[in-house]
């Protein structure tokens, strides 16, 4: 007798069948995953403190705004019955080990039917085994590593999704923009080599930049003195400095680069999309700065949803919406659409609904989920002048 080897996807489905929890259901989905009762519980496994706390707080704001909006309108339509959403927030403290334990708590104790977060690739990766084991999908609003949704053999993790484009798309788009719009022929790269985020985006920029990369330097997250490496870079003839990293180091690098007399444009990725970066760099140094992102209020004319969303966000939180809040806001509505498409709030059905998302109309643009659970969507580039967003470019 021949024994067929089970695929990763099928194995995950079988594995999680023993973890059924929640309300009784007559659907086949009741044999696995978690089921919603009168309230749809969505877990939020988020970096609310620690190194990535700035991103996590943004995402919490976006999630709560979406939940409040949906509940005010009566809730989610689950096969003709309206059910309200309850967001259950857990702080993973920007720690991979805590992210993993929070994932277990949310799925096995809180009995959530879907999870949003973690925000970062490393923390999100730590939760993947739990998602596949318990059949509770998680949607990261901002993880960017190219292979985030895939296992080591290139197979799709069935219960892992993201609402943000891959990091290599940021790198390639930045390379194109630098060459075609900024007219840069020579680029220098200063990247964070302590995370998949920085390494992956830097690699893509280097691969797709049509000019010459004259220098590539690396640093570790937590470094505070970049004067030596910036002096070395300054000695090279370059037209743009590319810095794919998180806001803490980006802010310090911008400050020290300008103080060292580097006047060329500085580009980065979505890690720059936090007001804390400008507080670190100083507004006077944050001019001719560009970064790739999924959202900016500056492109409201190209998306009718942006203006009304930003007004609601500003009314609630007293400021314009940042990128990660918009991404997490869309994430809640993507889960809502998945539930309404499948006419079920069972976790397995939500997974199926997320995989089917097509032409989702969000504040971060139109989104279609591809076969590898990555979204297809346009990218935006923001320009900072004196620390303030001054212009937005939509790159398709």
List the predicted regions and their residue ranges:
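Short, low-complexity disordered leader/linker segments with a strong preference
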Residues: 1-41, 72, 395-396
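Beta-alpha junction/loop-to-helix N-cap segments that form part of ligand/metal-binding clefts
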Residues: 28-32, 54-58, 76-151, 219-224
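Extracytoplasmic "Venus flytrap"
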Residues: 34-64, 90-96, 119-122, 190-199, ...
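Short, polar/charged alpha-helical segment
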Residues: 55-78, 203-208
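Hydrophobic alpha-helical segments within soluble ligand-binding/sensing domains
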Residues: 99, 162-187, 199-201, 225-227, ...
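Extracytoplasmic ligand/sensor domains, especially the bilobed periplasmic-binding protein
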Residues: 112-215, 263-290
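Extracellular/periplasmic periplasmic-binding protein-like sensory domains
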Residues: 254-329, 389-396
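Segments of small-molecule ligand-sensing domains
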Residues: 315-322, 336-389
